[in-house]
């Protein structure tokens, strides 16, 4: 194993899910039965939280400024993601324990805290653990010809479990001839669908097909179009996490003034 580039493909489903559950179970056990250990006490300290936030933001800043997304797959980045999730999980468990230990009823639980923190954990965790299952392939759909071969971004070929056939292609243009919009009528696994730019077809749960290009010189006479198959089976978990964060932010916005008024 290279120290920098992790073999991400090795951790595809179900291994990534098993590892995620094992890590979750281990952290819960440590918090319940080894709460006074040096490791747990550090993870619950303000220093651990500051380090987690700063390292995560620094990683995001480096990736955003350099544009090198492959950095996310490096060993240091993996350790930062694991550390961030671990600290966040311990903070959530401590917050939940404080709520239940005081005998708080369900309606009195700080849902703002739980929704925000659990939402971040779910969004980051699904992106991290689901990365090995994510993939993007390009297909050259040919007019009236069944195609099953696709290509990864590194140029290697792969076979998809269904056929794609280009049936028709249309280009709408401005008066000066500049393309305004283009769409392709494609047969996908026996089903005829219409693909437009930024209007993908959901072939299955977590798999979308996008129209990304065509023969610009031939226009509507193009004998092929370029499709991109994006596989992100964990994206719905990330969406749920984002919704939880939005709900937590709304509760924070609604409940904040009331809490301040009570203190006054």
Residues covered by each model-derived region:
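Solvent-exposed, non-transmembrane regions of integral membrane proteins
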Residues: 1-264
């Amino acid at each position: 194993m290279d120290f920098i580039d992790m073999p991400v493909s090795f951790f595809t489903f179900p291994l990534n899910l098993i590892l995620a559950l094992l890590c979750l179970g281990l952290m819960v056990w440590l918090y319940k039965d080894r709460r006074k250990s040096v490791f747990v006490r550090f993870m619950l300290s303000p220093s651990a939280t500051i380090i987690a936030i700063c390292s995560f933001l620094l990683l995001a800043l480096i990736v955003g400024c350099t544009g090198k997304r492959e950095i996310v797959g490096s060993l240091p980045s993996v350790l930062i993601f694991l550390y961030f999730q671990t600290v966040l999980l311990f903070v959530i468990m401590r917050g939940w324990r404080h709520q239940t230990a005081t005998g708080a009823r369900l309606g009195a639980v700080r849902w703002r805290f739980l929704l925000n923190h659990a939402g971040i954990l779910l969004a980051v965790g699904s992106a991290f653990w689901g990365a090995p299952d994510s993939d993007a392939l390009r297909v050259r759909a040919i007019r009236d010809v069944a195609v099953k071969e696709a290509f990864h971004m590194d140029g290697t070929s792969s076979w998809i479990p269904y056929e794609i056939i280009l049936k028709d292609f249309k280009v709408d243009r401005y008066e000066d001839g500049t393309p305004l919009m283009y769409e392709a009528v494609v047969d996908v696994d026996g089903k005829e669908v219409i693909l437009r730019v930024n209007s993908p077809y959901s072939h299955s749960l977590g798999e979308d097909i996008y129209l990304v290009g065509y023969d610009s010189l031939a226009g509507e006479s193009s004998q092929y179009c370029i499709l991109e198959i994006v596989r992100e089976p964990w994206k719905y978990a990330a969406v749920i996490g984002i919704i939880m964060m939005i709900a937590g932010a709304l509760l924070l916005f609604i409940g904040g003034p009331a809490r301040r008024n009570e203190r006054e």
